[in-house]
Amino acid sequence: MRGHCRWHARARNAGLGMAPARAADERLSAVFRGGTQRLCSDCEALASFRSGTPRLCSGLPVEARRAMISCMEKRGSKHRFSPGRPRTRVERSADGPPGAQSPWVQLRSATLHPFVFQRMVRAADPAARPGDVVAVYDKAGALFGHGLFNPQSQIAIRMLAYGETPIDEGFWRARFGQAVGLRRQLGLDQVTDAYRVVHSEGDNLSGLIVERYADCLVFEIFALGMFQRWSEFAAMLADELGPPTSLDRPYKAGPAWRTFVRADAQIEAIEGFQAAAAQQEAPARLVIREHGVRYRVDIVGGHKTGFFCDQRDNRLRLARLCGGADVLDVCCYTGGFGLCAKVAGGAASVTGVDLDEAAIELARENANLNQVRVDLVHADAFAYLRQMQANGRQFDVVVVDPPKLVTSRRDLEEGLAKHHDLNALAVQLVRPGGIMLTCSCSGLVSRDAFLGAIHAAGRRTGRALQMFDYTGAAPDHPIMLNCPESGYLKAVWLRVL
């Protein structure tokens, strides 16, 4: 029996069974509804509740659940919760720090992390509007820095600079100049026409991602203040980048950069803007080049900005291990790893599987674009891997690159369980001595937690896993050490024995 919490361990030690406990689940749901509460230090798997849905480990024994409910009822009687209470709002006050610049915000506690959450804000200037650049003061009234303000977001302030640095046109141009300068130092224009120009917190521009695809700049926006200024930023970036250049031929669109703005619907709702209101100039699809492979990118309907530039270096490295190999690309999206393995690496065969039907269709187009044959399957990855295992199918190289499985801290346990299960299935499809590359793009999943899930998958299947490297995102995705989340991508290279 695989345990996820202390209750599983106690149940195992007591020899309890795994009988269904739906009635206990319903009773527990009825006891606590609404809000996010941390109720019992002994119930790690049930540390948080949201919208009345308990975070129960699947298969928890009836006796353990009953004991847990009793414990939580007693704990709950000691507190008076207000179910469904609204989240904290930033308080407005006319009494700011002495001599404060307007608009201002004063903090309860200061941090060098670029995110300042609502609970950290003591008071805000009534004149401060959503999206404004505000002067940020510490609790003693000293100027701490400047940031973008949005009282309706949980991230009330996104810090831009510390100390007395003014936020003016010169500031923005300097930041974009630093970002473009790094990409020039990396020599990316000589090897690809698809790379990340601005990496949000990694480039000290929290809330803004800019991707270059051919002659188009795609803006992915996470902050209202960035959305309000995106057209100015586009002009500044065009000045810094100069006219778009091609790897092998001039672009038909001419010397000017085209632009496109997109944002996740949930981000739009939280931050209070609509990307559709921005001018949309770019075509729905563009063709890019990377490592000699051509990819068609859907910047309108594709995931994120349409392509995963962060895996560029990992794609080439994997291709160099695929000469004459049978390759399985799990969660293949539009064929990034698989096509690079086939075209640049000389793989004997490539099979790609993904649940997104539109992505599979685009992967087929990309295979035709490169005049190669790959097998592409529209299926759920878990079901497909089980089917291949039942059929006795194995591969020389297996890539596991799922979408983000942990989007919030309350999803961490469930997301790690999915990583464990997916890797446990995939590792059984690797021939002895074969290679497996497994990835996580969830910033909330630490390196140790991810490695733990992989190690558990190996133990569960009886396969010895030899890690020969650990990599991350390509260098156009820099990491600021005061924001470890900017180093979100984890790529573990394994030899399966």
Residue ranges and their predicted role:
Residues 334-347:
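Conserved SAM-binding loop of SAM-dependent methyltransferases across substrates and taxa
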Residues 349-354:
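Conserved SAM-binding motif I beta-strand of class I
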Residues 198-211, 229-308, 316:
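Non-catalytic substrate-recognition/targeting regions of SAM-dependent transferases
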Residues 69-214, 244, 254:
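Non-catalytic accessory regions of SAM-dependent methyltransferases
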Residues 358-394:
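S-adenosyl-L-methionine
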Residues 324-331:
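Conserved class I S-adenosyl-L-methionine
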Residues 394, 421, 435-497:
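C-terminal catalytic and target-recognition region of SAM-dependent MTase-like enzymes
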Residues 378, 395-425, 431:
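Mobile active-site "lid"/loop adjacent to the S-adenosyl-L-methionine
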